Amino acid sequence: MAAIRKKLVIVGDGACGKTCLLIVFSKDQFPEVYVPTVFENYVADIEVDGKQVELALWDTAGQEDYDRLRPLSYPDTDVILMCFSIDSPDSLENIPEKWTPEVRHFCPNVPIILVGNKKDLRNDESTKRELMKMKQEPVRPEDGRAMAEKINAYSYLECSAKTKEGVRDVFETATRAALQVKKKKKGGCVVL
């Protein structure tokens, strides 16, 4: 039986952990060096609920320089991972300000999984000290859940690519969401 093919696109601010999350899931190794993304695609096989799914993983660059290029990733998307970093309250603020409007515009009706990356930094002392200097604190789980509700996300999950905690769960949930969407002949994302 042929595998079911689904397309996942990951979005979020630059340096919020998108590429690391994809690399840890698809290659099971954590990249120690930060390399800003242009566009990288991976394919990963995942089994959920007894179904074999070939998940095409589309990485995107969060930096503003790529705002005009990023929409090229959106056509025929089945599920969106919308990421922020737990050590960056500003990246959470950009979820309703920037990412939700962009995704809803290009991918109406595509399920969104809101993902809090870098969970391991929530209790990291040096991270907390740095944030305190700016009168901020790491994003709390309830803030993430409230945001997921606000943007009408399919689900809210937290993970750490570094420790691998929660990583598989993110992709299993995303795959389930993608499988639930019944595509019309022309459905999916549109580029206008």
Swiss-Prot record:
Ranges spanned by the short sequence motif Effector region, renumbered to the chain: 34-42
A GO MF term: GTPase activity
Pfam family, one: Ras
Alphabetical keyword list: Cell membrane, GTP-binding, Lipoprotein, Membrane, Methylation, Nucleotide-binding, Prenylation
Propeptide residues per the UniProt entry: 190-192
Keyword Cytoplasm: no
InterPro entries associated with the record: P-loop_NTPase, Small_GTP-bd, Small_GTPase, Small_GTPase_Rho
Compartments reported by the entry: Cell membrane
Binding residues for GTP: 12-19, 59-63, 117-120
Record PTM Cysteine methyl ester, positions in chain: C189
Record protein name field: Ras-like GTP-binding protein RHO
